[in-house]
Amino acid sequence: AGARLDCDVTLTHQRCIVDELCDLFTECGATRVDIKDLRDGSHSGYRAIHLHLRFPAGFAEVQVRTALQSHWANVYESAADIFGRHIRYLHEENCQGSLSPEEEIIVKLLHVLSKYISQVEKERDECSSVHPSDDLDYNMKHRQKITFELESDIQTTLDELEELFRKVRESRRK
């Protein structure tokens, strides 16, 4: 059993949500709650925080992702639907499966986007820690503007890849 929470929040708020959920699940009878933070040591680009829950009735998992982490993961799943599940393991030596040069470029682009997302989210987190009523210096205002623009560019690129994958799936149905 499991659930996924996709939230339009900063990294700090993502962690706060996880901490609140840990407390809530413990109050509700979880005998064990383990946190697995996949934001820095991603697996094939995937980033999130997972809660592994143990209850007397069994196990459950809750994934908490930011909006960008979620968008990336959904696009990557679409790529895996088209190119094959093995794309998750291309970094491993004995990975079975091959990609065309074009497919390989797209998968590598997704991995690069994941790294950019990580950097942009860290920057967004830092910029958002400044209280709006504080007198912002020019550099901070500039950083906030650039961070917003980069986030928007990443969203646009993910949207374009999503549309490309939709068209590929459509053409395969014909």
Task: Please annotate each region the language model reported.
Residues 12-15, 42-44, 69-72:
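Short, well-ordered, mixed-charge alpha-helical segments that flank or form enzyme active sites
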Residues 1-20:
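Charged, compositionally biased non-catalytic regions
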Residues 58-174:
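An acidic, glycine-/histidine-flanked metal-binding catalytic module
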